[in-house]
Design a protein with these regions (language model features):
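ATP/adenylate-binding site constellation spanning eukaryotic-like Ser/Thr protein kinases
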Residues: 11, 51, 70
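Short alpha-helical
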Residues: 15, 41, 72
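Structural micro-motif
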Residues: 50-58
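Non-catalytic, surface beta->alpha helical segment in thiol-disulfide oxidoreductase systems
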Residues: 60-89
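Local sequence-structure signature of Cys/Sec-based thiol-disulfide redox active-site neighborhoods
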Residues: 1-27
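Surface-exposed charge patches
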Residues: 22, 26, 56, 75
Length: 90
């Protein structure tokens, strides 16, 4: 997959957030983790992007996946890879 800007909005105590980070690391995805508990502006941005206060939220080049587990993240990532391979499919 071509290089993408990946931001993961997390809450430090959230087990689903830890699973998302583990999935990204296991798949060698470079990402920026943003703890919304310690950053009010990031929390507000997460809500603006996702429409909710629940974490995790991942943003990949403007595409949003919110309140997910590893299976949903794998499906989301697969769709992104498919779009990279077949740009007309968007």
């Amino acid at each position: 997959m071509k290089s993408k800007r990946v931001r993961l909005f997390i809450k430090s105590y959230c087990p689903w957030c830890h699973k998302a980070e583990r999935w990204l690391k296991d798949h060698a995805v470079r990402y920026q983790a943003i703890d919304v508990i310690s950053d009010e502006a990031a929390f507000a941005e997460m809500i603006r992007l996702s429409g909710q206060e629940l974490a995790p939220v991942i943003e990949v080049d403007g595409r949003i996946l919110a309140n997910f587990g590893p299976e949903q993240l794998a499906e989301f990532w697969s769709r992104l890879e498919n779009e990279d391979a077949h740009p007309a499919a968007r």
